[in-house]
C-alpha cells in the first residue's frame, strides 16, 4: 500500500481474514477510522473479527497540518485511498469516538457515488456521541483530558492531545450527514459504553443522536466499561464479540441476496 503524508501508509491492515481452504467468498471487510487522537492504536487490541479489518489513521497527526475543509476534506481523502487500495464490493464502516463520525461521513459519500463500486452494508459507532457544539470552546481552551497508559511516550501523548484539539475545532463546522433522495441509509449500530467517564455524568441511551432532525441510530447495544476503558483487558473480549456478531448480522441479508442471484 502506497505511502501518504508523513510516511504513513493508509489503509493499515489490522486483521487479515484467512482464505486458505475456504470455497465461499470472504466476508465484507470492516473499515475502521481513527479516534480523535488520529491513531489506530486501540483497534490492535481487538480479538479476531473473522474478516479483513482495515484502518485509516490521520496522516497529518504528526505534522499538525490542518484539514482546511474539516471532516469533509478528511473523509474525501480517505475515500480516495479506499478506492485505490480496497477491493470494490460490500463494506462495513465503523470507528471509536471521532472515528464513528468519519464512518458516517464516508457512508454518505459512498451512497452518493453510484460509480464508486462500494456498498455500505452497515455502520458501527463505538461509543460515538452526537457532537455538542456547546462543549467545543471549553475543550479547545482547556485541552482534552485523556487517561494515557503508562507505556505511551510523552511525544505521542502530545501528538494525541494536539490532534484532539484540532479535531474538536473541526466538529464546530460539522453536521450529521443526510442520505440523498432515493438512497436508503445503511443500518447504524451504536455500541455504547455502559459507564460514563464521570460517575455523575448523565448520558442518554443514544448519546444525543436522538436530538438529530433525522434518525441516525437504528439500534443500541451496551458494552462494559467507560469511553476510555472499552479496549482494556477486562472489556475487550465483550467488545470484540459484540463487534464480530454485529458485523455478521449486518452482512447476512446481502450475502443471501448475492447467493440467490
From Swiss-Prot:
Q: Keyword Hydrolase: yes or no?
A: yes
Q: What induces it?
A: Expression is up-regulated more than 10 fold in toxin producing cultures.
**What EC number(s) does its UniProt record assign?**
3.1.-.-
Gene deleted: what happens? Produces smaller amounts of AM-toxin than the wild type but still causes lesions on apple leaves.
Task: Note the superkingdom of the native organism.
Answer: Eukaryota
Q: Which UniProt keywords apply?
A: Hydrolase, Virulence
Record flagged with keyword Zinc-finger: no
Choose any GO biological process term that the UniProt entry carries and state it. Answer: biosynthetic process
UniProt xrefs under InterPro entries: AB_hydrolase_fold, Thioesterase
- Which terms does the record give in the GO molecular function aspect? hydrolase activity
Top EC class of this enzyme = hydrolase
**What pathway, per the record?**
Mycotoxin biosynthesis
Q: What else is known?
A: Gene clusters encoding host-selective toxins (HSTs) are localized on conditionally dispensable chromosomes (CDCs), also called supernumerary chromosomes, where they are present in multiple copies. The CDCs are not essential for saprophytic growth but controls host-selective pathogenicity.
What does this protein do, in the record's words? Thioesterase; part of the gene clusters that mediate the biosynthesis of AM-toxins, host-selective toxins (HSTs) causing Alternaria blotch on apple, a worldwide distributed disease. AM-toxins are cyclic depsipeptides containing the 3 residues 2-hydroxy-isovaleric acid (2-HIV), dehydroalanine, L-alanine which are common for all 3 AM-toxins I to III. The fourth precursor is L-alpha-amino-methoxyphenyl-valeric acid (L-Amv) for AM-toxin I, L-alpha-amino-phenyl-valeric acid (L-Apv) for AM-toxin II, and L-alpha-amino-hydroxyphenyl-valeric acid (L-Ahv) for AM-toxin III.
- Protein family membership: Belongs to the AMT4 thioesterase family.
Official protein name in the record: Thioesterase AMT4
Query: Which organism is the protein's source?
Result: Alternaria alternata (Alternaria rot fungus)
Amino acid at each position: 500500500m502506497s505511502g501518504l503524508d508523513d510516511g504513513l501508509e493508509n489503509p493499515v491492515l489490522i486483521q487479515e481474514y484467512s482464505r486458505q481452504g475456504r470455497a465461499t467468498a470472504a466476508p465484507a471487510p470492516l473499515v475502521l477510522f481513527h479516534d480523535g487522537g488520529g491513531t489506530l492504536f486501540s483497534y490492535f487490541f481487538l480479538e479476531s473479527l473473522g474478516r479483513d479489518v482495515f484502518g485509516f489513521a490521520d496522516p497529518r497527526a504528526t505534522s499538525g497540518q490542518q484539514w482546511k475543509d474539516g471532516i469533509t476534506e478528511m473523509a474525501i481523502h480517505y475515500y480516495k485511498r479506499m478506492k485505490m487500495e480496497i477491493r470494490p464490493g460490500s463494506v462495513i464502516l465503523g470507528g471509536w469516538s471521532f472515528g464513528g463520525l468519519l464512518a458516517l461521513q464516508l457512508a454518505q459519500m459512498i451512497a452518493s457515488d453510484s460509480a464508486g463500486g462500494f456498498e455500505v452494508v452497515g455502520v458501527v459507532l463505538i461509543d460515538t456521541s452526537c457532537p455538542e457544539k456547546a462543549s467545543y470552546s471549553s475543550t479547545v481552551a482547556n485541552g482534552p483530558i485523556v487517561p494515557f497508559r503508562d507505556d505511551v511516550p510523552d511525544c505521542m501523548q502530545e501528538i494525541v492531545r494536539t490532534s484532539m484539539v484540532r479535531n474538536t475545532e473541526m466538529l464546530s463546522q460539522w453536521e450529521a450527514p443526510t442520505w440523498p433522495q432515493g438512497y436508503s441509509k445503511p443500518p447504524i449500530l451504536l455500541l455504547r459504553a455502559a459507564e460514563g467517564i464521570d460517575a455523575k455524568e448523565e448520558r442518554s441511551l443514544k448519546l444525543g443522536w436522538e436530538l438529530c432532525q433525522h434518525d441516525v441510530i437504528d439500534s443500541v447495544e451496551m458494552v462494559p466499561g467507560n469511553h476510555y476503558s472499552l479496549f482494556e483487558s477486562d472489556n475487550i473480549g465483550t467488545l470484540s464479540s459484540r463487534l464480530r456478531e454485529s458485523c455478521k448480522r449486518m452482512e447476512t441479508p446481502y450475502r443471501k441476496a448475492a447467493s440467490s442471484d
